[in-house]
Amino acid sequence: MSKFWSPFVKDLVPYVPGEQPKLSRLVKLNTNENPYGPSPQALAAMQAELNDDLRLYPDPNGERLKQAVAAHYGVQANQVFVGNGSDEVLAHIFHGLFQHDLPLLFPDVTYSFYPVYCGLYGIAHEKIALDERFRIRVEDYARPNGGIIFPNPNAPTGCLLPLDAIEAMLKASPDSVVVVDEAYVDFGGESAIALVDRYPNLLVTQTLSKSRSLAGLRVGLAVGHADLVEALERIKNSFNSYPLDRLAIAGAAAAFEDDAYFRRTCQAVIDSREALSASLQALGFEVLPSAANFVFARHPRHDAGQIASTLREQGVIVRHFKQARIDQFLRITIGSPEQNQALLDALHFLK
């Protein structure tokens, strides 16, 4: 701790990102990256940007990407916000759209960046317990609040809240912004973007890190009423007017335009998820229903932390959370068929 740190920094508890090991021989199933590469069209679009124009600043508004997102979802470009990863988009949302006189509501088992942002921006919050099956009870959110945010499908459980339940939540809190964090929605959910024209208090965030295989590019977005998007633009232009570089704008736009590749690779992940779930159940695991590119599983006779350690010794990395309610679960990314088989082979000690 430095004497130059402010009291604010001294008390800050930062987010801990998933491990990015340096050894390439490891089977990496801990951070929910896509086992299939980016769209060839996206790679070609980025390659085309490697020219003398890199001496120039990029489009601060990312209009090409906004137009591609708007066309994909059937919304207007002024309903789309883009940023340097969905974490940055979420940071702007916490900073500019949640009230401070009432608590922000989010699940007790959720994306662990939410409480970090609350600490960073001085936002009071309440964690609402998921039910015994790790599902949101919509009625628990029908209380005075300064905003609501939740991942759908949930991270880390993979459980999905249907659109009719989201709509009920929106109706119950018409004066608060409700943010649906859809990092994993393309692997089995239906996007709440279908509701944005009916509910001015709804904002939906997404990332290109998962279903579009661009985690290394850092591109995220939000879709909602133009008034909400304008607020995010005001914050962006008071913080970093050029959040996306030329390669990111071109590659992300092309990824949205290559719908055939997107659908094919998403379906491959879904098929592998169902196969891996069945294989894990055959080994005695309880596997929660998942609409994401990972499964959340526990074994009734083996400690989750010990399983994770044993797997690591065999070169397979999965995610173990030392958190109440879920400390006996493992979150396992859906890898390639070869990676999934390596995981199952490493679990031979459970037989």
Swiss-Prot record:
Its cofactor is pyridoxal 5'-phosphate. The keyword Transmembrane helix does not apply. It comes from the Bacteria. One of its GO terms (molecular function) is pyridoxal phosphate binding. It catalyses: L-histidinol phosphate + 2-oxoglutarate = 3-(imidazol-4-yl)-2-oxopropyl phosphate + L-glutamate. Pathway: Amino-acid biosynthesis; L-histidine biosynthesis; L-histidine from 5-phospho-alpha-D-ribose 1-diphosphate: step 7/9. The modification N6-(pyridoxal phosphate)lysine is found at residue 210. Keywords: Amino-acid biosynthesis, Aminotransferase, Histidine biosynthesis, Pyridoxal phosphate, Transferase. The keyword Transferase applies. Its EC number is 2.6.1.9. It is an enzyme of class 2 (transferase). InterPro entries: Aminotrans_II_pyridoxalP_BS, Aminotransferase_I/II_large, HisP_aminotrans, HistidinolP_aminotransfase, PyrdxlP-dep_Trfase, PyrdxlP-dep_Trfase_major, PyrdxlP-dep_Trfase_small. GO terms for biological process: L-histidine biosynthetic process. Pfam families: Aminotran_1_2. Belongs to the class-II pyridoxal-phosphate-dependent aminotransferase family. Histidinol-phosphate aminotransferase subfamily. Homodimer. This is Histidinol-phosphate aminotransferase 1. It comes from Pseudomonas aeruginosa (strain ATCC 15692 / DSM 22644 / CIP 104116 / JCM 14847 / LMG 12228 / 1C / PRS 101 / PAO1). The gene is hisC1.
